[in-house]
């Protein structure tokens, strides 16, 4: 057989046959179901994920780090997750930490140890970590604190970061000085040199920064061997999951729409895209494989830290919501600010994410109120504005236009189906649904999995 080149070969490559007609969009493969926060975080995403994870084969995280907090209650045991996908509880499910997540390895193992004591078993057989995920170092956390102190000194205010090193790690990623899990898995001497160079860069910017590099490298060498069996090429892992046998794949978003680096109340936001685009970039999957996108919202609104909050109630109502709702941050332990449900932000979150349905949580917290208000529009100088303001100073000046509803004044915590809810609570839910133009699929009336009323 001749392996030489011929004129025929040339013709076949330079004049390929035309592709007939328009190429169809490749919609093949399993669809990925996505759960996202629709407010400022702490909406109860973990509970919705937990419900769906019972039937899922894979649950993934696509962005954020251990600055997020999910609480899941199973058989009266309360599990707290920060980096681990909450699907890790399900023994038949693989949990995947994607390339868009930033991983603090000491934090990851501390979280695993805590949840093991509560009964989590066999996690190492069902956890996969992307080799392209970036590493959060202890010195990133120290820098996070120094930056907050600097902001406070210069501007008289800070961002209210969790000081978990998330922002500095994403900044390193963008400036191309970051290190990834694949670097830790490769030559450790080369990895060590790059870590030392990064520390020197930071110390030139922050002369007071003290770092015990050798101690951190020693710990990282130990962690490297512990995670080595869990590390995979995330792109190929997700491709096989989507294009292999039929699987149910679920993605749990961290943080929320109004904390998104692009679409949130900047600069009081997180450092990643926590809207639907972050799912594609944080896992390495095509948009065509995104299926249902579920938005999660409380029946009222909360926010941790500083930043604009148009429907905030700095009064007895806000205090009652805070107390009844046990509104304390899972990650920070800070009290959450509380206010009425804001449909302007919910509609805005839907515009970005294209929610196919909503989960409305913590309806039972409103049970004791005589009247309940819902923010339906913003006004500036008495005139309605047709959009959610990007500029923070404008947002802080808006007046909120409210619709007022009579309270139902009865306990909803035992409700397990739509018909069990009082008529006034049903009216409230239908109003929210109609205003934002998205069906409400679940209504939460308590902490446990059983307290989620499924509507359809």
Swiss-Prot record:
A single GO cellular-component term from the record reads:
cytoplasm
What pathway is this protein a component of? Purine metabolism; AMP biosynthesis via de novo pathway; AMP from IMP: step 1/2
Is the keyword Cytoplasm assigned to this protein? yes
Q: Which residues carry this modification: Phosphoserine?
A: 130
GO BP term, example: IMP metabolic process
Question: What is the active site of this protein?
Answer: 42, 70
Q: Which reaction does it catalyse?
A: IMP + L-aspartate + GTP = N(6)-(1,2-dicarboxyethyl)-AMP + GDP + phosphate + 2 H(+)
> Which positions in this protein are listed as binding substrate?
42, 330-336
For the ligand (GTP), the binding residues are: 41-47, 69-71, 336, 362-364, 444-447
* Cross-referenced CDD domains: AdSS
The protein's job, in short, is: Component of the purine nucleotide cycle (PNC), which interconverts IMP and AMP to regulate the nucleotide levels in various tissues, and which contributes to glycolysis and ammoniagenesis. Catalyzes the first committed step in the biosynthesis of AMP from IMP.
Protein name, as recorded: Adenylosuccinate synthetase isozyme 1
**Organism of provenance:** Danio rerio (Zebrafish)
């Amino acid at each position: 057989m001749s392996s030489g080149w011929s004129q025929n070969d040339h013709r076949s490559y330079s004049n390929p046959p035309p592709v007939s007609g328009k190429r169809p969009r490749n919609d093949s493969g399993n669809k990925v179901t996505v759960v996202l926060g629709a407010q400022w975080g702490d909406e109860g995403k973990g509970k919705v994920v937990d419900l769906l994870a019972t039937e899922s084969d894979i649950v993934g995280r696509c962005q954020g780090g251990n600055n997020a907090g999910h609480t899941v209650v199973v058989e009266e045991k309360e599990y707290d997750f920060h980096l681990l996908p909450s699907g890790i509880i399900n023994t038949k499910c693989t949990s995947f930490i994607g390339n868009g997540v930033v991983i603090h390895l000491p934090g990851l193992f501390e979280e695993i140890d805590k949840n093991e004591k509560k009964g989590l078993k066999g996690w190492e057989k069902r956890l996969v970590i992307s080799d392209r995920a970036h590493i959060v170092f202890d010195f990133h956390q120290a820098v996070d604190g120094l930056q907050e102190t600097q902001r406070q000194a210069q501007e008289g205010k800070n961002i209210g970061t969790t000081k978990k090193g998330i922002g500095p790690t994403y900044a390193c990623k963008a400036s191309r000085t970051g290190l990834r899990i694949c670097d830790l898995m490769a030559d450790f001497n080369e990895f060590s040199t790059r870590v030392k160079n990064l520390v020197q860069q930071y110390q030139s910017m922050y002369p007071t920064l003290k770092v015990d590099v050798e101690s951190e490298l020693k710990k990282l060498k130990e962690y490297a061997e512990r995670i080595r069996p869990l590390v995979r090429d995330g792109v190929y892992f997700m491709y096989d999951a989507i294009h292999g046998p039929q699987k149910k794949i679920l993605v749990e978003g961290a943080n929320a729409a109004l904390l998104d680096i692009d679409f949130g109340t900047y600069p009081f936001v997180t450092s990643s895209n926590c809207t639907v685009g972050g799912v594609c970039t944080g896992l390495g999957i095509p948009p065509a494989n995104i299926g249902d996108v579920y938005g999660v919202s409380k029946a009222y609104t909360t926010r941790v830290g500083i930043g604009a909050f148009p429907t905030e109630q700095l009064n007895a109502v806000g205090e009652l919501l805070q107390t009844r709702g046990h509104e304390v941050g899972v990650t920070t332990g800070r009290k959450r600010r509380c206010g009425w449900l804001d449909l302007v932000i919910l509609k805005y979150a839907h515009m970005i994410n294209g929610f196919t349905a909503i989960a409305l949580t913590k309806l039972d917290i409103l049970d004791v109120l005589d009247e309940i208000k819902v923010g339906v529009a913003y006004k500036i100088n008495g005139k309605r504005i047709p959009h959610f303001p990007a500029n923070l100073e404008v947002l802080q000046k808006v007046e909120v236009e409210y619709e007022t509803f009579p309270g139902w004044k009865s306990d909803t915590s035992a409700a397990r189906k739509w018909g069990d809810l009082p008529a006034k609570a049903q009216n409230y839910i239908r109003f929210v649904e109609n205003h934002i133009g998205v069906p409400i699929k679940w209504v939460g009336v308590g902490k446990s999995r059983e307290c989620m009323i499924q509507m359809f």
